[in-house]
Every structure is written in C-alpha cells, then in structure tokens.
Amino acid sequence: MTEQNRPGTFEQAVLPHLDAAYNLARWLTRNEQDAQDVVQESCLRAFRFFAGFRGGSARAWLMQIVRTTCYTWLHANRPLQKAAEFDENLLPDSRTPGPEEVVLQNDNGAVLRKALEMLPPNLREVLILRELEEMSYREIAEITGMPAGTVMSSLSRARGRLRQVLTGLTNLDTMSHPQRIGTVST
C-alpha cells in the first residue's frame, strides 16, 4: 500500500465500524466523554499501525484496538477495582425510589442498561460484542484473545449473571412497589 492511498483505504476500512467502536468503549468506560476519547485515541493508533493490517475483518481489528485502548485508559485513569465474581452489594439499595426513578426502573431499556453496567467488565464485554454488536464467536475470540470455547463459556456466565442481576433489580422494584390485592373494609 502506498502512502498516497493510505488515508482513503483506512477510511474505507475503519469508518463503517466507528459506531460499534463507540458502543464498546461506552459500555467499558461507562461514560460518553471517556468513550469518545478512547475511540479517538483508538483511531489514531489504528491509523498509525494501518500499514501492519493484513486484511481480514477490519471490524474485529478495530474493536481489538478499542478494547486494548479502553483497558489501558481505565487502568491509567481510574482506581483499580477488583471485581468479585458477583457482589450482592452492587445491587441497588432497597430504599423507596422517587417518582422519576420509578419511571426509569419500569422502562425495560433503563433496567437492562443498569443491569449490564453491574456486570464485571470481562463479562459485560463479551455480552456487548455478541448481543449488541452481533459479532461471531470467532470475531470475539480474535478481539479478546480468548479461545472460541472460552468465549462461549464466558457468554454463558455473562447471561447467567445478567439474569441474576435482572431478577434482583426486578425483585427490588416489586418489593418497593407492592401491588394492592384488595382493600379491607371495616
């Protein structure tokens, strides 16, 4: 590849995947501005090393760079958090939520986003790549550096954890908002 056609080729390979890159960065950093910074840094790295790209899936190649950049950024900018396999203390407290919170909690999308953010990063990552970005096991394996079998077992664990978290969130919502079955008249 000549220097002259490098920018055009790079744009053709990378630009179609920027939304997926941002989505992954957003879920890993949990912050829109940080995700934008990570994607920008990832694109700079991708451009710098584009000459080394040997073909194949440009999407998987870019997502691998985004993933690595995210973890590097998180390590440098956030205190190291040791994630327990599943920490019950991460579930929201059982206080009665205000009216605005009730509306958000009843919205399935908001509950799902909250549940996804409660997963450990390694499980959240494979779930986002598979379910939201619709990547194959092979692509996820390429991005994460895991064998395909490990990707499948991680996805199974992630789905199980997500189910537990969603059940916990749903139970908390119904406990704090019990339905009236009937009234007792005197």
Pin down the residues of each PLM region:
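C-terminal flanking helix
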Residues: 18, 22, 43, 120, ...
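The alpha-helix within a helix-turn-helix
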Residues: 39, 141
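A short pre-motif secondary-structure segment
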Residues: 126-130
